[in-house]
Amino acid sequence: MKAKRRFNIWLWVLLCVPCLLASCDHNVHDGEEESGLSVSLTWADEADQGTEVKDVKLWIFNADDGSLVEEKHYGSAQEVASQRFALPEGHYQILAITNLIEPFFTTDQTRALTNWNNIQIGLTNPKDVKHNAYFGVTDVRIDNKEGNYVVQNPVKSVLAELTIIIENVPKGTEMSGKALDAAWCLFPTQKNSDGEYGLPSIKPTEVEMPTILATESTLQSEVIRLMPTIQGSPASHVYLRLLLPNGTLQEYDITAPAMKVGGKYELRLNYNQMQPKMNLEATINGWTNLNNEVEIK
């Protein structure tokens, strides 16, 4: 989805800039015979622009009683944008999830989702996830005084992303490990402690990290995608194993700030300064919240 900053009376296009969850534009399709509600997906995080959208699932719920009004499945964001929903007057909440393909799943995929508060996004296998899924929640009030409504729904990544970099390691060192307290699932329609949609479960799961071989003096993992830290925990915990070329096994227990929904993080360490137990704070070198380095325009 590419950024566009305006649309005309005949063609409205996707906006790829952050916007308010409750934003709603009127009269976008004035002059057209068909009226109703249309949904425009946008990127909440500018860093996600350019991500291919392969699959979109959309649910519209009655915000007053939580009942399901519409459930749709699309192949692209453009298909979503072209759909119009003829809805009676009322208050509605909209959930969109993109790229919800293996290993991602939602609650009870064999039947329709009928309860707004119980929707879950999970992973059939949390190890070595190659792509992210994205979700967005917004609401709209329909009063039928205007014939056409366009609601913009910003989507953000479900999983946190972590990159581990260790400098000055002996060449041939192998790194493996696991994240100990990633959430088992995410409730996309419930708000977290920051007041944002996306509440991690209380139930944890361990996420095994792929084994990486240091071919040079710097060992760098690929992006590790995992569920955010469990609900209520102020910290995340990472267990690392380094197998040196001489067969020595070294183990490290690392405590770092909690990983949030859609967060992007970098753990950078110097092998010569590593200790069996390390407590990293957000204010010191070693743990970097990459979200703070992404310019939001």
Task: Specify the residue positions occupied by each region the protein language model found.
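Bacterial N-terminal signal peptides that target proteins for export
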Residues: 2-12
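Intrinsically disordered, low-complexity repeat and linker tracts
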Residues: 4, 25-34, 273-297
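C-terminal motif of bacterial Sec signal peptides marking the signal peptidase cleavage site
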Residues: 20-23
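Short amphipathic, basic-aromatic surface patches that mediate peripheral association
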Residues: 26-49, 166-172
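Tryptophan-paired
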Residues: 52-109, 174-261, 292-297
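Structured interaction patches on ligand/partner-binding surfaces of diverse proteins
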Residues: 76-78, 102-149, 212, 246-274
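Short strand-edge motifs at loop-to-beta-strand transitions and within beta-strands
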Residues: 81-83, 149-153
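Conserved "repeat-terminator" motif of extracellular CCP/Sushi domains
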Residues: 152-159, 226-232
